[in-house]
Amino acid sequence: MAEFDISRMNILIVEDNLHFRTHIRTILQTLGVESVEEARDGAEAFEVLLSFDADLAIIDWKMDGQNGLDCVRRIRNDEDSPNRFLPIIMVTGYTEESLARDARDIGVNDFLGKPISAKSLMSRIAAVLEDKREFIDAPDYFGPDRRRSQQEYMGEERRKK
């Protein structure tokens, strides 16, 4: 994994728990990030994004008010969304594989289980920056390509050489 300088990034933290918001902000400041905005729920996050040009959003799954899934849906699908292509890392204490799939299926770029450390957060940020997946615009989905790897074709090669 390449080293990234994230000090000039604008990062939005969406988390209803003040202590965890502060924890994430402190980690980001330790990593050199100076421009951080916060929101307590998805609705507030959308309002912040109208005036804050975020390069990345770190969004909690379960919050009072508008939850993380609804927030991501709105960012990806709302016609008034300021940035449908915003890289999004979802953080949660619920780490079941089915929940990670649900997050991926609504347009999250990456998923990080709580508790988080500076190392785990930086690893996810680097993965999102490194893995520039194409965005898919389909009738029932808008977001990063959900396929993580190329599937090997197992059939007969029919191309002429």
How would you describe each model-predicted region?
Residues 18-37:
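Two-component/phosphorelay signaling modules centered on CheY-like receiver
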Residues 38-56:
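Acidic, metal-coordinating helix/loop segments flanking the phosphotransfer/catalytic sites
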